[in-house]
UniProtKB/Swiss-Prot annotation:
Origin species: Yersinia pestis
Transmembrane segments: 23-43, 46-66, 98-118, 141-161, 163-183, 213-233, 234-254, 268-288
Gene that encodes it: ubiA
Compartment list: Cell inner membrane
Name recorded for this polypeptide: 4-hydroxybenzoate octaprenyltransferase
Function description: Catalyzes the prenylation of para-hydroxybenzoate (PHB) with an all-trans polyprenyl group. Mediates the second step in the final reaction sequence of ubiquinone-8 (UQ-8) biosynthesis, which is the condensation of the polyisoprenoid side chain with PHB, generating the first membrane-bound Q intermediate 3-octaprenyl-4-hydroxybenzoate.
């Protein structure tokens, strides 16, 4: 294989795993760090932290691969996804399957260094990562499944650090699901016209003209759940300031999606990286 061909193939694999678009990894990373710091009431054990950070990137990459495999016959009809490696033929279906298996094996190898409770919970993480891409064909609520998939590192984090799943763990998971449905609805608003044309379901379609209101309510629920978590964990004032800052970011996002235009809706989605970061900094400073 010529050097230029190898380079082209490598670039295609990177695009398939979204290495060039880290936003998904970051949106998966922040809830993971929330959980690890809350479960350990401060900085978690270095080994656990490394395992989860690497796991975030491996599992996000695996999720992108299976998502593109599930959508390989419809991505060519959507403007934003038509040039992806599978619909464009740069990567074959067999190659994508092999890559998915490799990424899952790497992830599971990491989990095997943790306790048995975390290992068992990881099986649910695999199931959620696999079924999510197919949910948009059977329900208008695939974003709820995505929220569970993106948030499953939360119970895994608590299990790894404390070998327990307290109330705070489940409240944090619920907050993350609300947040994920909100930001992924913003993302789905970008593709709403294409999705309606090809018959793909999403919360953006389900919510219709009430989309902005429901996104706002989900964002409010996220903030209120975070307040409850702060109270239960006796977090300091820095955490509550971070909640206020997150609320300001949500308000800014509402302004961006006001006209339901593609580019501003996508920018609103990207802005959620700062929400996750701000909330993590609030937790971090509280345990300083």
């Amino acid at each position: 294989m010529k050097g230029s061909t190898v380079h082209t193939k490598w670039q295609a694999y990177c695009r398939l795993m979204r290495i060039d678009k880290p936003i998904g990894s970051l949106l998966l990373l922040w809830p993971t760090l929330w959980a690890l710091w809350l479960a350990g009431r401060g900085i978690p054990e270095a080994k656990i932290l490394v395992v989860f950070v690497l796991g975030v990137f491996f599992m996000r990459a695996a999720g992108c691969v299976v998502n593109d495999y599930a959508d390989r016959h419809i991505d060519g009809f959507v403007k934003r996804t038509a040039s992806r490696p599978l619909p464009s033929g740069t990567i074959s279906e067999k190659e994508s399957k092999i890559l998915f298996v490799v990424l899952i094996l790497l992830s599971f190898g990491l989990v095997l260094t943790l306790n048995s409770m975390t290992i068992w919970l990881s099986l649910a993480a695999l199931a959620l990562a696999w079924i999510y891409p197919f949910m948009k064909r059977v329900t208008h609520l695939p974003q709820v499944v995505l929220g569970a998939a993106f948030g499953w590192s939360i119970p895994m984090g608590f299990a790894a650090v404390s070998e327990s799943l307290p109330l705070v763990c489940w409240l944090l998971l619920l907050a993350n699901i609300c947040w994920t449905v909100a930001y992924d609805t913003q993302y789905a608003m970008v593709d709403r016209d294409d999705d309606l044309r090809i018959g793909v379901k999403s919360t953006a379609i389900l919510f219709g003209q009430h989309d902005k209101l429901i996104i706002g309510l989900l964002q409010l629920a996220t903030l209120l759940l975070m307040v409850a978590i702060g109270w239960l964990m006796n977090l300091g004032g820095a955490f509550y300031w971070s909640i206020l800052l997150a609320g300001a970011l949500f308000t800014h996002q509402q302004k961006m999606i006001a006209q339901r235009e593609r580019e501003p809706c996508f920018r609103a989605f990207l802005n959620n990286n700062y929400v996750g970061l701000v909330l993590f900094l609030g937790i971090l400073i509280s345990y300083w």
